């Protein structure tokens, strides 16, 4: 008789068998090999990609400076935010809520939303998108930065207009719609 637990699946289980091609992934947020992306003032570090999770979700470490955050948008996937540091003001279908460190927000697919750091301190969020793909959009429209806390370069008016045009053009490929400010 074995003293360990039986790690094989039961023959009548409805759960698929283990896929030995997939491995445990340990990600360290300060790993210099992770992609650090600057997006109009915010810095996003992809901790887990769709490739890591068989497309099920991605995990992004977001550093949002005072005044930062994305414009109104919506997308055809679920998105959750865990506030790790600071606080953000989230607008969901036109209603504003404040989420502070230790709190979680969940945005259902297709719902218009945005978030904004109205405080005078840095905010840090962990963002989960399911299924994955948003991390690819960020990589296409953003600019690489050195670390997860490196601020992206400041954009002049022309560069910001070019960024917005590029984001608007690529958004549909990533099941995202950028909305007008109310």
Please identify what each model-predicted range represents:
Residues 65-67, 101-102, 110, 120:
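Tight coil/turn sites that cap or link beta-strands
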Residues 2-56, 154-182:
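A short, N-terminal "cap"/entry segment at the start of jelly-roll beta-barrel domains
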Residues 121-169:
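A contiguous, mid-protein "functional segment" used to position or interact
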Residues 59-66, 74-92, 128-131:
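Short, conserved beta-strand element in jelly-roll/cupin
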Residues 87, 94-112:
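Short acidic-glycine-tyrosine-enriched beta hairpin
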Residues 48-49, 69-75, 116-118:
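Short histidine-centered beta-strand/loop micro-motifs
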């Amino acid at each position: 008789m074995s003293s360990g637990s039986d790690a094989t699946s039961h023959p009548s289980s409805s759960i698929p068998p283990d896929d030995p091609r997939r491995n445990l992934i340990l990600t360290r947020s300060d790993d210099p090999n992770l992609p650090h992306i600057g997006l109009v003032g915010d810095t996003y570090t992809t901790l887990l990609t769709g490739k890591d999770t068989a497309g099920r979700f991605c995990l992004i470490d977001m550093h949002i400076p005072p005044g930062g955050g994305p414009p109104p948008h919506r997308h055809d996937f679920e998105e959750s935010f865990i506030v790790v540091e600071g606080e953000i003001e989230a607008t969901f279908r036109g209603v504003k809520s404040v989420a502070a460190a230790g709190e979680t927000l969940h945005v259902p697919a297709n719902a218009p939303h945005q978030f904004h750091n109205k405080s005078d301190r840095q905010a840090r969020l962990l963002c989960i998108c399911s299924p994955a793909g948003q991390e690819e959009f960020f990589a296409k429209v953003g600019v690489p930065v050195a670390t997860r806390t490196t601020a992206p370069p400041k954009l002049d008016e022309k560069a910001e207009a070019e960024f917005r045009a590029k984001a608007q053009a690529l958004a549909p490929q990533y099941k995202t719609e950028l909305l007008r400010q109310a």
